[in-house]
Amino acid sequence: IVSDNGASAEGMEGSVAELNAQNGIPTTVAEHIAVAEQLGGLDAIGGPKMDNMYHSAWAWAGDSPFRYTKLVAADWGGTRTPMVISWPNRIKPDKTPRSQFTHVNDVVPTIYDLLDITPPKVVDGHKQDPLDGVSFVSTFDAADAPEVKETQYFDIMGSRGIYHKGWMASTFGPRTPWVAAVPDLSDWDPM
């Protein structure tokens, strides 16, 4: 699996301290430059002294050709990532990408299928929930194999999406990752 999910847009306009961006603390380019110079110049960026976060526009670019970014359960920019499977003794070399929809929760059922393992119903006296995923072994030998995953639900911080038989429906939640989520003090209710 090439990445955890889409590129991250929480950096808003960019920051030398990711927690500033995540907590909606605005900073300026001049402040970024001053901090970088104080910590060793441009060579400090990306090193152990900084926890920098790129501009949200770079996240959109990084998720191309899909729209949106990490923390948005919509339109693949925040949810779709490539996976490469290699098993020279079982899978014949084939340069054709597979476009069948799969999800990370399909990996274990696929491994169980390959190893002919039936998932246990009870482990150490504890009843086990059934696995959510399905095996995608059929795609190993046939680039045009029919999809086996029919439905997958996505939800992150109120942003929701559902994939069903080739269709995707989605909606934004209460927070947009590239906008500072700082409520007005009158909106705070400590009780």
What are these regions (language model features)?
Residues 24-65:
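Surface-exposed acidic, glycine/proline-enriched linker/cap segments
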Residues 49-76, 91-100, 104-191:
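C-terminal cap/loop subdomain of S1 sulfatases and analogous C-terminal strand-loop tails that border
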